[in-house]
A protein has these predicted regions:
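Conserved small/polar residues in nucleotide/adenosyl-binding loops
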Residues: 426-433
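Exposed beta-strand and adjacent loop surfaces of beta-rich binding modules
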Residues: 421
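Active-site helical microenvironments for divalent-metal-assisted chemistry
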Residues: 1-292, 296-348, 353-412, 424
Length: 433
C-alpha cells in the first residue's frame, strides 16, 4: 500500500493568483464534536467518552453568546483544540482540558467547579494553560522572550501536557489568523516563530512544528510566501511525476529484496525550502532536495538493509549521509538520511525509519503520552520516558541560577534547544520585508 504523493500544500487554494489556506468555514459545533469523537474512537475504540461529552456540553453553554473575530461561535475554537490533541492521540484528560482551556479565563466557570466535575488532573491542566495565559511578547526584547520561555518550561516541568494544549491552541489560532488586523498577524507570526515553533521542534512534534513554521512565514512575509507557492506550483506536475517514479522504483527493489516497506514521496514544506534558500543564498530551482522519499520498514535491521539496496540503485552524494538511528537527535528523532542522484541527474533525499520511529518523528513527546493503562487502570509513564526529558531538568536548574540574558544564551547554545532553527530564524528576520 504505497501512497505516492503526500502534499504539504493540501488545502491551499489559488485566489487572485495567491495560495491561501481555506479557512474552516462556519462550522456546526455538533458536527465538529462528532468528528472529535470519531478521531478518539479510531485510536482508542474502548474508551469511555462520557467525560468528553460532558466537557463539550459545559463548554458549549459556558461560551454561549461569545464569538471569535471570524464571526464564528467561540466554541468552534476549543473543539478544534480538542481535535488537534486527538490527532496526537492523547489521553482523554488532555482532550477534556483542551475543550475547557478557556472557560476559567473567559466565562463564569471556576477552577473549583472543574475539579468537582472532572477531577483534579483535568483542573490542574486547565489551570496550567490559564496561568500561561497571554504571554507578553516583544520581538526586540530579549528579557520578555526569556521570561516567556521560563514560564513555558516551568509549566512543562509540572505536566508536559499543558504545553501540548498550548501548542494546539496556538496552531488553531494561526490557522484562523486571517481574521486579525495585519499588524496583529505579524506580531503573532513572529511570536510563533520565536517561541512556539522551536518548542514544538524541541518536543519532536514535527506535524505541529512544520505547520506553525509555514503559517508564520505566510503572515510575517506574505509576498515571499505566495511567491514561493507559485514557483513550486509552476513545476508541480513534473515534480510529482519524478517522485512517483522514484517511489515505484524503490517499492519494486524493496519487494525483490524481501524487505516489507511502505514508500511515500513528498515535497518539502515551504518554510524548510525558504530556510535553505536564505541560508544557502539560492533560488528555488537551485535547492536540490526539494522532495524527500520516506521508507518505513519493520525493524532497525531492515533500515540498514534498505539503505544498502538504495545505495546500489542510485549514486549517493558524498557527505550527505546521516545516521540518526545510532545518534538520535536531542528531541528523540531517529532515521537514516541519505541524498542521492537519480538516473536523470536529479538529486533527492531518502529517509528510512521504522513505524515506531515515524510515530516519534510525527508526535514527539506526545507519542509517549498515549493511553498506557496498567493493571489497576491508572496511566503510567515509564521511567525511560522521564529520562528523555532530562534536558528539561537541565533547563530548570539553569532557571534558578541565571539572569534572563544568560538563560537565553544557554538555551540557544549549550543545550542546543533551537539548534536547527536558532540561527536560521535570526537570519530570516534580517530578510523580512
Amino acid at each position: 500500500d504505497n501512497k505516492v504523493i503526500e502534499n504539504p500544500y493540501k488545502g491551499l487554494e489559488i485566489v487572485d493568483g495567491h495560495a491561501v489556506k481555506a479557512p474552516e468555514d462556519y462550522q456546526d459545533p455538533k458536527m465538529l464534536y462528532e468528528a472529535l469523537i470519531k478521531r478518539i474512537r479510531k485510536y482508542h475504540p474502548s474508551t469511555d467518552i462520557s467525560m468528553v461529552e460532558k466537557a463539550f456540553n459545559i463548554a458549549y453553554h459556558a461560551h454561549e453568546g461569545q464569538f471569535r473575530k471570524s464571526g464564528e461561535a467561540y466554541i468552534i475554537h476549543p473543539l478544534w483544540v480538542g481535535i488537534i490533541l486527538a490527532d496526537l492521540e492523547l489521553d482523554k484528560e488532555t482532550i477534556v482540558a483542551g475543550i475547557l482551556h478557556d472557560v476559567v479565563e473567559d466565562t463564569v466557570m471556576t477552577e473549583q467547579e472543574i475539579t468537582e466535575i472532572f477531577g483534579s488532573e483535568v483542573a490542574l491542566l486547565v489551570d496550567g494553560v490559564t496561568k500561561l495565559g497571554q504571554l507578553s511578547y516583544s520581538a526586540d526584547k530579549l528579557e520578555v522572550q526569556a521570561e516567556n520561555l521560563r514560564k513555558m518550561f516551568l509549566a512543562m516541568a509540572k505536566d508536559i501536557r499543558v504545553i501540548l494544549i498550548k501548542l494546539a491552541d496556538r496552531l488553531h489560532n494561526m490557522r484562523t489568523l486571517q481574521f486579525m488586523r495585519p499588524e496583529k498577524q505579524i506580531e503573532k507570526a513572529r511570536e510563533t516563530m520565536d517561541i512556539y515553533a522551536p518548542i514544538a521542534q524541541r518536543l519532536g512534534i514535527s506535524r505541529i512544528k512544520t505547520e506553525l513554521d509555514d503559517l508564520s512565514l505566510k503572515y510575517s512575509q506574505p509576498e515571499v510566501f505566495y511567491d514561493l507557492v507559485q514557483q513550486i506550483n509552476a513545476r508541480k506536475t513534473e515534480r510529482e511525476e519524478f517522485v512517483q517514479q522514484i517511489v515505484e522504483e524503490v517499492s519494486e527493489h524493496m519487494k525483490n529484496a524481501k524487505i516489507k516497506a511502505e514508500v511515500k514521496g513528498r515535497v518539502k514544506h515551504f518554510f524548510s525550502i525558504y530556510k535553505k534558500m536564505v541560508n544557502q543564498d539560492k533560488t528555488v530551482d537551485q535547492i536540490y532536495d526539494l522532495f524527500a522519499v520516506r521508507i518505513i520498514v519493520e525493524s532497525v535491521k531492515d533500515c540498514y538493509a534498505a539503505l544498502g539496496v538504495i545505495h546500489e540503485m542510485y549514486t549517493p552524494i558524498p557527505g550527505r549521509f546521516k545516521d540518526y538511528i545510532a545518534m538520535p537527535k536531542p528531541n528523540m528523532y531517529q532515521s537514516l538520511h541519505t541524498t542521492l542522484m537519480s538516473s536523470v541527474g536529479q538529486p533527492f533525499e531518502i529517509q528510512i525509519r521504522t513505524e515506531e520511529m515515524h510515530k516519534t518523528a510525527e508526535y514527539g513527546i506526545a507519542a509517549h503520552w498515549k493511553y498506557k493503562e496498567s493493571n489497576d487502570g491508572k496511566k503510567s509513564v515509564a521511567a525511560q520516558e522521564e529520562e528523555k526529558l532530562s534536558w528539561l531538568r537541565q533547563i530548570l536548574e539553569w532557571q534558578q541560577d541565571t539572569d534572563n540574558r544568560e538563560f537565553l544564551s544557554l538555551l540557544k547554545g549549550d543545550l542546543d534547544l533551537f539548534a536547527e532553527d536558532a540561527v536560521s530564524y535570526t537570519h530570516l528576520r534580517a530578510h523580512e520585508t
